[in-house]
């Protein structure tokens, strides 16, 4: 078999496509065509990932909002319970005072 060249889309030995070569644009001078190609690839990747990221952000925001509302609601509930318990305690004190008054008055 002939060895795979630069234009060969598949590696004939392993049947795999070649990976893109990683470059550092700050060290290597790139042509405008290469820069344009890089921007197009980045834009395509960003547009491909954007809907999934947006969905995750919405779900995360709704989850955090639900947690905040739950804490807020529980705070109101616990404060109303404390007020209710304070009223019961006041009634119990009044009942004890009446009982003491009856006991001392008899």
Curated annotation (Swiss-Prot):
Pfam families: Coa3_cc. Residues 2-57 are mitochondrial matrix. Residues 1-34 are annotated as: Disordered. GO terms for biological process: mitochondrial cytochrome c oxidase assembly; positive regulation of mitochondrial translation. The modification N-acetylalanine is found at residue 2. It is found in: Mitochondrion inner membrane. Residues 78-104 form a coiled coil. Signal peptide: none annotated. InterPro entries: Coa3, Coa3_cc. Residues 79-106 are mitochondrial intermembrane. It is a single-pass membrane protein. The keyword Mitochondrion applies. Belongs to the COA3 family. PANTHER family: CYTOCHROME C OXIDASE ASSEMBLY FACTOR 3 HOMOLOG, MITOCHONDRIAL (PTHR15642:SF3), CYTOCHROME C OXIDASE ASSEMBLY FACTOR 3, MITOCHONDRIAL (PTHR15642). Along with COX14, core component of the MITRAC (mitochondrial translation regulation assembly intermediate of cytochrome c oxidase complex) complex. Interacts with MT-CO1/COX1, SMIM20, SURF1 and TIMM21. This is Cytochrome c oxidase assembly factor 3 homolog, mitochondrial. It comes from Homo sapiens. The gene is COA3.
């Amino acid at each position: 078999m002939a060895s795979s060249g630069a234009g060969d889309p598949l590696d004939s030995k392993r049947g795999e496509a070649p990976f893109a070569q990683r470059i550092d644009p700050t060290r290597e001078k790139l042509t405008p065509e290469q820069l344009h190609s890089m921007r197009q690839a980045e834009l395509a990747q960003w547009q491909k990932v954007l809907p999934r990221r947006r969905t995750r952000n919405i779900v995360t925001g709704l989850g955090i909002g639900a947690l905040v509302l739950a804490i807020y609601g529980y705070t109101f509930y616990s404060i109303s319970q404390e007020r209710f318990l304070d009223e019961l305690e006041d009634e119990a004190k009044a009942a004890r005072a009446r009982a003491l008054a009856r006991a001392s008055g008899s």
